[in-house]
Amino acid sequence: GGKYLFYIFCGISISMAIIYYSSSKDKLDILFKIVGGILLVELCIALLESFTSFRLPISPYSSWLQYFGKDPVSFSDFDNIFVYSDFRPPTGFHWNTNNLAIAMILILPFFLCSHQIIVKVLGTIAITVIIIMAASRAVFLGLIIIICFYLGFIKKKIATLSLIWMVILGLFWGMAQLSESQNPRINEIANSMEALSLYLKGDIDVGGSLEWRRELVNNGLAALKESNGLGVGAGGSVPIQEKIGGVAGRFTSMHNFWIELLVEGGIIFFSLIIGWYISITYNLFKISKWRENPEIQYYGSALFLAMIGFVPAAIAASSTIYFFPMWIMFGLSISVIYAYRRKRFHQHTT
């Protein structure tokens, strides 16, 4: 419980520091450049880790790991389709490949919303590659949702979005029809597409990931019921899982951020948090439509998509309460909303 509260304190402190610092538009621009620069470096490192043997010393696959007092990670701990291969996915500045994927999904909208075509295309491709290498179902779903919301709500290209979905569905349907082809090369491609489809739908459960995640959730909901909906307290879900003996003999974190909030905070607190989250997201959506200040509109559009994509992506991590990019996203979102309101107030008073 104490460690959990410490994470919350650090996270809120980061968000508040961002809000306090971003008291002017110029400072907000500087902050975005600093955060963007750090995440851009991580993106480059993740690409190196994806296609070369390069690893940061803190990576769970680094040969230097023992000098940091840590043991090599059990790859089966990750919900990853490469679990039985020799491939080791990128981790960037994070210990867990899922956490890297979530960080990438949060910066994807800033590339998508860029007015520079080359930045938009190269950034989107790079992040998509990293997320595929991380092979996280929840984050991949977040990527699809972000692109759909970008085309539907930001660019308002409903026809383009519909065409893309028709092509994708047609591709999978066509591959399904070709799965019985006598041509071995066509048959191999078709079956690979079918395997990908089954994996994304959860019909292929790598390492029993979906099974133990469901068990963790069921244990948490049972504890919530015993508390009469009041919650088990901050960090309380971990001791409950430990008393049971841990799921699959080793998992004690909830591995679902939203269920974690519900189980630990209770129904009332959870409802307040969800209401707050929806309010922030809606305000960012309004800013994405405000054309009088292109920079604030850009920030609002990107953060709106990031908040949307984070909803499914947050399920990928064991917990995001200690995930600093989430707290940075919250701080930047509130800062942009305040900047928008200051601009609107200034317009009405002049």
Q: What would you call each of these model-derived segments?
A:
Residues 1-23, 29-40, 326-350:
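Membrane-anchoring hydrophobic segments
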Residues 6, 10, 23, 36-39, ...:
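Transmembrane alpha-helices of multi-pass, membrane-embedded glycan-processing enzymes
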Residues 9-17, 29-153, 165, 308-311:
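Alpha-helical transmembrane segments of multi-pass inner-membrane proteins
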Residues 17-27, 111-117, 148-157, 281-289, ...:
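Structural signal for the C-terminal ends of transmembrane alpha-helices
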Residues 44, 48-54, 134, 154-204, ...:
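A membrane-periplasm/extracellular boundary helix in multi-pass inner-membrane enzymes
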Residues 117-120, 144-152, 242, 264-309:
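Hydrophobic transmembrane alpha-helices and their immediate junctions
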Residues 159, 279, 301-350:
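Transmembrane alpha-helices of multi-pass inner-membrane enzymes
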Residues 198-265, 286-291:
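Long extracytoplasmic/lumenal interhelical loops at the membrane interface
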